[in-house]
Amino acid sequence: MSVPKTMFQLSGRGYAAANLSHATLVIIDAQKEYLSGPLALSGMDAAVQNIKQLVTAARNAGRPIVHVRHLGIPGGLLDPQGPRGRFIEGLAPLGDEPVVEKRLPNAFAGTDLHERLQQLGHLDLIICGFMTHSSVSTTVRAAKDYGYRCTLVDAACATRDLPYQHELIPARDLHRM
């Protein structure tokens, strides 16, 4: 039996994974909310360590990093004024690294992310963060609409189990999709 091909492979329009020397690192929602509590994600320890490695490599290479932060409801999940809405230790922006604040899963919707990326002048994006099934995948798909070439670092992403029709879809299955 043959292995199915992706749409990119079938169309001949695929591209190689981004090289950090020509890319912008985009970190999505690296916030404390996902470490514990009702939105705790599976595989966070490994994902956080892998994001830290990406951040270190980008900073050492002088590459741009854009941080995306989800603004929840005051007193609720991802509370922008509360501790759970803050960046995870070691993943907070330094110096002039920009922060794009969003209220929807798509980091381009209602934000200046596209303009900031245009100013940086790179079409190649290396994307990581949380949650794989929501903000990460939605942002990657939207980036394609703007003409960006995205490399998703799956080992630097995490998600959670989700309910579906009285069953559970495990995080590991969602993450693979």
Language-model region placement:
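Catalytic metal-binding/acid-base residues of hydrolase active sites
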Residues: 31, 71-72, 105, 131
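A short alpha/beta connector and helix-capping loop motif
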Residues: 39-67
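Short beta-strand segments at enzyme active-site cores
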Residues: 28, 63-70, 153
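Short acidic, Gly/Ser-rich segments with clustered Asp/Glu that frequently serve as metal-coordination loops
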Residues: 32-36
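Active-site-adjacent betaalpha module
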Residues: 1-24, 52-56, 78-177
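Class I S-adenosyl-L-methionine
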Residues: 75
